[in-house]
């Protein structure tokens, strides 16, 4: 590592610039160190890429094991120290939050671009020229995706299902992907809203509940909400049809006074009257609820035992300590309103569901709220024989939900299997000579990096990458073969659109943007100044966590 903490004047007098323990890496060494970090992260993810990719076993400091091939999860659980590595993880997380998929594509493409940039640096091409060439290549890549993308609407159920199948195909749950893809498409279509002429999908309205037990094929879609609580009183009904639901953000308990108060009781009759008055207060609250016609109460706060007794006597099913998010979803699903004051509750505030029922799921009891007229919130109850299978199924479903939502929102899809990448590379090679100069080399390097994704797909499937790449290049010379990609199960080039390997155009575009942004950012850095670590100080991670906690309290 090149270090320079001391400089000298023309007279040779030393001048201390940085504190003792600090280090500085600059020039080509800084560039190479940053590129090496990007390449190292790519190497960690490369073997998981594509439907024939492998899984990673991640063990944390407590010994907890995660088995996954989800790019965002792997990066999240990697304890990275290098600042450039952390930067790449942030970009990958941004990709995951924006489009729910394509994190591996973004990181691996960034790694390939970094490798090609390193080759150009060895040829004495300045980083600024490489960045300029990469930016021009990015524009062509995005333009290509926009031009070849196929329009898709929310009514194209078959295409949406294929998008879900493609996303699930690379996950550990691929054996149940046909069944899960149907659930995903139905769930997203149910919560989608038309605003003006654009479709909007808020995936927060798809509740995911996990319960260990059964198999992945026991996973079910509920047109309503699953509340992970049981009915509060054994005397209450466990099943209510044509349910009228009161959603309460208020407790069914005798509230304590805000100010400290003392009550002096001189004889037992006063104590009896005191308890009787408490009971009357609770009875009045229950009577007010019953008067609205409610036969189900779902409460965010507590329900006193006396109130439970009176609710049971009136045949009302009640649930307490429900999560705030569950109440909000129930309001959307049933058309009800969350009420903070029981005195203000009216029949107009009640939600409706065809059925509210307590069911045993595994070893636990849960309350299912189903059959709302037009539920804008739905639930997916995930089952699986192992907890790790359940967790991986959740990750797979979240990615699939995100990709289907992306297609509905954006209205465009492209074929997978490397078809888009080879088409981009072809157009970049035609464009590069028009630019000329050293930038031409950078654009051609970008084309080679894009093709690197196809070679990794082929390698992970046990195929000869160069042989398959040449076959695809030859096929794409014919304009009618734009959707030809690599069928990784047969090893032959095929029309990926006809084969049903379809991906959101938005995911591809965001991956190209994220990868190019990451590499151009790295190429612009020519100096790394690292402060020395203070002895006996807290780990930086703990300090950051404490800062976050303090800011959240404020």
From Swiss-Prot:
Gene Ontology molecular function, alphabetical: ATP binding; ATP hydrolysis activity; ATP-dependent protein folding chaperone; identical protein binding; unfolded protein binding
Segments of this protein annotated with the region Disordered: 532-554
Keywords recorded for this protein, A-Z: ATP-binding, Chaperone, Nucleotide-binding
Biased composition (Basic and acidic residues): 540-554
CDD domains per record: cpn60 (cd03343)
Keyword Lyase (UniProt): no
Database matches in InterPro entries: Chaperone_TCP-1, Chaperonin_TCP-1_CS, Cpn60/GroEL/TCP-1, GroEL-like_apical_dom_sf, GROEL-like_equatorial_sf, TCP-1-like_intermed_sf, TCP-1_chaperonin, thermosome_alpha
GO biological process annotation, one example: protein folding
Keyword Nucleotide-binding found: yes
Family statement drawn from the similarity comment of this UniProt entry: Belongs to the TCP-1 chaperonin family.
Record's subunit section: Forms a Heterooligomeric complex of two stacked eight-membered rings.
Purpose of the protein: Molecular chaperone; binds unfolded polypeptides in vitro, and has a weak ATPase activity.
Xref: NCBIfam families: thermosome_alpha, thermosome_arch, thermosome_beta
Xref: PANTHER family: CHAPERONIN
Protein name: Thermosome subunit beta
Gene name for this UniProt entry: thsB
């Amino acid at each position: 590592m090149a270090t320079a903490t001391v400089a000298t004047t023309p007279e040779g007098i030393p001048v201390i610039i940085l504190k003792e323990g600090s280090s500085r890496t600059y020039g080509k060494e800084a560039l190479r160190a940053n590129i090496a970090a990007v390449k190292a992260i790519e190497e960690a993810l490369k073997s998981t890429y594509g439907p024939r990719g492998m899984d990673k076993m991640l063990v944390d400091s407590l010994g907890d094991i995660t088995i996954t091939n989800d790019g965002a999860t792997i990066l999240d659980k990697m304890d990275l120290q290098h600042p450039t590595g952390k930067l790449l993880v942030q970009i990958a997380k941004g990709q995951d939050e924006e489009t729910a998929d394509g994190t591996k594509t973004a990181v691996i493409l960034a790694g390939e671009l970094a490798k090609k940039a390193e080759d150009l640096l060895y040829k004495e091409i300045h980083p600024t020229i490489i960045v300029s060439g990469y930016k021009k290549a990015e524009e062509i890549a995005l333009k290509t995706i926009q031009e070849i993308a196929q329009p898709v609407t929310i009514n194209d159920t078959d295409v949406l299902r294929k998008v879900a199948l493609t996303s699930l195909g690379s996950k550990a749950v691929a054996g149940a992907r046909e069944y899960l893809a149907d659930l995903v498409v139905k769930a997203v279509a149910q919560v989608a809203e038309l605003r003006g002429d654009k479709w909007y999908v808020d995936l927060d309205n798809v509740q995911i509940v996990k319960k260990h037990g059964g198999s992945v094929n026991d996973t079910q879609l509920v047109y309503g909400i699953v509340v992970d609580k049981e009915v509060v009183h054994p005397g209450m009904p466990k099943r209510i049809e044509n349910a009228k639901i009161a959603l309460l953000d208020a407790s069914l308990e005798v509230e304590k006074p805000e100010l400290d108060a003392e009550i002096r009781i001189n004889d037992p009759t006063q104590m009896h009257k005191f308890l009787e008055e408490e009971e009357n207060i609770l009875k009045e609250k229950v009577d007010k609820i019953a008067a609205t016609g409610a036969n189900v109460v779902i409460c965010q706060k507590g329900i006193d035992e006396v109130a439970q007794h009176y609710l049971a006597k009136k045949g009302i099913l009640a649930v307490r300590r429900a999560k705030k998010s569950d109440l909000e979803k129930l309001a959307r699903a049933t058309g009800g309103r969350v009420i903070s004051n029981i005195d203000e509750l009216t029949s107009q505030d009640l939600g409706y569901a065809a059925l509210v029922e307590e069911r045993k799921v595994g070893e636990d009891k849960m309350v299912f709220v189903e059959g709302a007229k037009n539920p804008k919130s739905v639930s997916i109850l995930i089952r699986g024989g192992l907890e790790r299978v359940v967790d991986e199924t959740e990750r797979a479903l979240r990615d699939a939900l995100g990709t289907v939502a992306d297609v509905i929102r954006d209205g465009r899809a492209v074929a997978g299997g490397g078809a888009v990448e080879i088409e981009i590379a072809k157009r970049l090679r035609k464009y590069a000579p028009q630019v000329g100069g050293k930038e031409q080399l950078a654009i051609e390097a970008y084309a080679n990096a894009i093709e690197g994704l196809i070679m990794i797909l082929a390698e992970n499937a046990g195929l000869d990458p160069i042989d398959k790449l040449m076959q695809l290049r030859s096929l794409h010379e014919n304009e009618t073969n734009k959707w030809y990609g690599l069928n990784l199960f047969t090893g032959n080039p095929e029309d990926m659109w006809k084969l049903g390997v379809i991906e959101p155009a938005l995911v591809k575009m965001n991956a190209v943007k994220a990868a190019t942004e990451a590499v151009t950012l790295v190429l612009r850095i020519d100096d790394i100044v690292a402060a020395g670590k203070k002895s006996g100080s807290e780990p930086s991670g703990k300090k950051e966590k404490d800062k976050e906690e303090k800011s959240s309290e404020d």
